Every structure is written in C-alpha cells, then in structure tokens.
Amino acid sequence: MKNARGFTLIELVMVIVILGILAAVALPKFANLQGDARAASIQGAGGAIKSAMAIVHSQSIINGDEGDATSTVTLEGTSIAVIYGYPARTSIASAAGISTDDYAVNTTTGVISLQTDCDVTYTNATATAAATAVTDVSGC
C-alpha cells in the first residue's frame, strides 16, 4: 500500500468553509475602518477649531477688543478677522490651521466637512453669546 501525500477533498472543503466563516465574522469589523478614520479626522478638526477659538479669544482679551463687533488679531503672522472676541467664520479655518486641500470649507455657512453629516459647524459669536463649534460624525 502506498503512503498517500496531500489533503483529501473533504479536508480542503473544510478549510475553505472555516476560512469563509472567519472572513464573514472579521469583514464587518475591518469594513468600517474608513468611517472611523473620517470620524477621527473631523473630531481632530473640531478640536483644532476649539483651540483656535480659545487662543483668539485670549488674544482679544489681551488686546482689549473682545467686546468689539469686528476687529483683527494677528497669530503667527496671519491676520484673523474677529467678531466679539472670537474668530469670524471667514477666518476660522486659517486660525485653526485647517487646509482646504483636506476639508471642504464653506466660509458662508461655517461648515467644515469631509462629507455630508461628517462635519464641524462653526457659528459666529454675537454680542450676547460666544462662538460655537459643533461636531457631527453621524455620517462618517
């Protein structure tokens, strides 16, 4: 009797079935990694905006113009438009160091986004309320 080498058909089928089950279980976990990366990116942009808001507001207080409807602050050689002590929508992206190469920046609405429902919405300050930055990662 010869000594057979190799796998039988049943062994090969079982290996394929096991690999299929593993792929079915593991694939959903890896499939959403892009969404997680987009969410982390937009949350990072939101954090940068909030930091820029604090820095500009601090500089406005130092300059004594935090109550003015419009003014400017210079940060690292860049002139930032300021409304009531906080960056204006038109200059929040440059104040936060957000590149238009990476994000869609709409200075009219104050929305900085990667895609729909994956964005940061910046609202200008008013005489009675501070500026706000709201992060939405529901569509990332």
What residues fall within each predicted segment?
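N-terminal single-pass transmembrane signal-anchor helix
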Residues: 1-34
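Residue-level preference for alpha-helix termini and adjacent loops
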Residues: 6-9, 32, 41, 72-74, ...
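Short alpha-helical interface patches
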Residues: 19, 27, 35-40, 89-100
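Membrane-proximal N-terminal amphipathic helix
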Residues: 37-63
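Periplasmic/extracellular, small/polar-rich flexible segments of pilin-like filament-forming proteins
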Residues: 58-140
